[in-house]
Amino acid sequence: IPRLNSYNNEKFSVLKKNHRCYCVIPIKAADMTFENIKLIHSTINCLKKSKLIKKISISTDYERDSLIVEDSKVQIIKRPYDLSDRESSLEDVLKYTLEKIESSGDFCDSISVAEIIYPFRDSKVIEEMIKIILDESIDTVFASWKEVRATWFGEEDELKMIGGSSWTIPSQKRFGQTITSLIGYFTVTKPKNVRNKTVFEGNIKTHLLKNRNTTIVCRNNIEFNDLYDLL
């Protein structure tokens, strides 16, 4: 019904306009350097293209006031050193960061995370994923890649194939496609899941990426510069 569709579109537009999605960029002190400035800025610039992201916060254990990110629209939140230990998880970092944000009376409708190691991420994907949270009754959605190549699990001397549908694999050993999570590419969830550290529990959905080039990982500026002219 045209009139009903028009009403639903208007309702969604209002919801979209009022929705407050915040994004956290977790960066360890070792990576908060001028050598990695391109990776940091490319992530920030990509997030800024989304009209649905209302605030960007860098969560870091970098001890000095940062001159690396001179941007009034980017909040720097200093976190304890122990949140960079191997025993700590992304959920620990997000929980601490959200608590610091909310302690000033600043609350959001959804919270997302983006790591600097994906400098070629597509800003349109960010919009699509936030809209999924708006439009569907789910707890968390994260970026992913559908892998057709053979995927193995285990130690080198005890490997077991868990998936793969490539023609290079013998037909009797094809187990279907596997989904590789790209959580650091972009993940969006609800604040309650961050507070309760249940980001990856409940009703979870993946958002399959179509352009493999946008999933390339660069862990420093040297890798970024080597690839930049090729893409």
Q: Where do the model's predicted regions map?
A:
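Conserved core of the sugar-phosphate nucleotidyltransferase
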Residues: D92, Y96, I116-K210
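A short acidic, often aromatic-flanked loop/helix-cap motif at beta-alpha or helix-coil junctions
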Residues: D82-R86, R149-T151, R212-T215
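Short, charged, surface-exposed secondary-structure boundary motifs
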Residues: F34, S84-L90, I216-C218
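Short, polar loop motifs at secondary-structure junctions
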Residues: T60-D65, K192-V194
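N-terminal glycine-rich phosphate-binding loop and ensuing alpha1 helix
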Residues: N8-T60
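Short phosphate-binding loop-to-helix
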Residues: E63-S112, F120-K124, E128
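Conserved alpha/beta core of the MobA/IspD/sugar-nucleotide pyrophosphorylase nucleotidyltransferase superfamily
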Residues: I1-K17, T178-L231
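Short, high-confidence coil segments that cap the C-terminus of an alpha-helix
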Residues: I53, D106-C108, D135-D139
